[in-house]
Each structure stands twice: as structure tokens, then as C-alpha cells.
Amino acid sequence: MRLFVFFMLCLLVLLQYHLWFGKNGLGDRHNLQEEVTLILENNSELRQRNQMMFSEIKDLKEGTDAIEERARNELGLVKEGETFFRIVPKED
């Protein structure tokens, strides 16, 4: 009977070891949960970025305001009749 109890105890320890420390055990599960959380956060950020890009593309296709703003900011263009003033900081 003692041999049977000893055998069952060893089996229990072996199974517990695999549960806690083995491949696909609780440690791996915890690591995977953290990885999934990081991936979901990254996906959320990318979705927001995509939405902003789609909005900008729609604005560029449909309206002239966005095109005008880009021409002013990126190319330094001005409308007819406008005067462009550039303020240069004083060098000490």
C-alpha cells in the first residue's frame, strides 16, 4: 500500500511540474496572454492611424481645402492677391 501511495505522490508531483513549468504550461499561458494584449493594443493604434489616413484621403479626393492647406504648408504657395510674410528670428 505504501508503494502505491508513493507512486501516486510521484505521479502527482510529475503532473504538477508539467502543469506549472512544462511546455504549454501556466507560465507559457501567461506569456501568451501578455503577447496577445500587446498585439491587440498595437492593432488598435494601427486602426486609428488607418482611420485618420482614410479621412485624409477622402478629404483630398472630395474637397479643395485639404489640397490648399498642403500647398501652403509643404510647398509655400500663396493665393493670388495674398502677401506672404516670413519672420526670421534674430541671431545673437
Swiss-Prot record:
Keywords in alphabetical order: Cell cycle, Cell division, Cell inner membrane, Cell membrane, Coiled coil, Membrane, Transmembrane, Transmembrane helix
Example GO biological process: FtsZ-dependent cytokinesis
Topology in the lipid bilayer: Single-pass type II membrane protein
Membrane-spanning segments: 4-21
Coiled coil: 28-62
A cellular component annotation (GO) from this entry: plasma membrane
Residue numbers on the Periplasmic membrane side: 22-92
Pfam families documented for this protein: DivIC
Subcellular location: Cell inner membrane
Domain of life: Bacteria
Cytoplasmic compartment spans: 1-3
Assembly description: Part of a complex composed of FtsB, FtsL and FtsQ.
Function: Essential cell division protein. May link together the upstream cell division proteins, which are predominantly cytoplasmic, with the downstream cell division proteins, which are predominantly periplasmic.
NCBIfam families xrefs: PRK00888.1
Family label: Belongs to the FtsB family.
Protein name, per record: Cell division protein FtsB
Lineage, uppermost ranks: Bacteria, Pseudomonadati, Pseudomonadota, Gammaproteobacteria, Alteromonadales
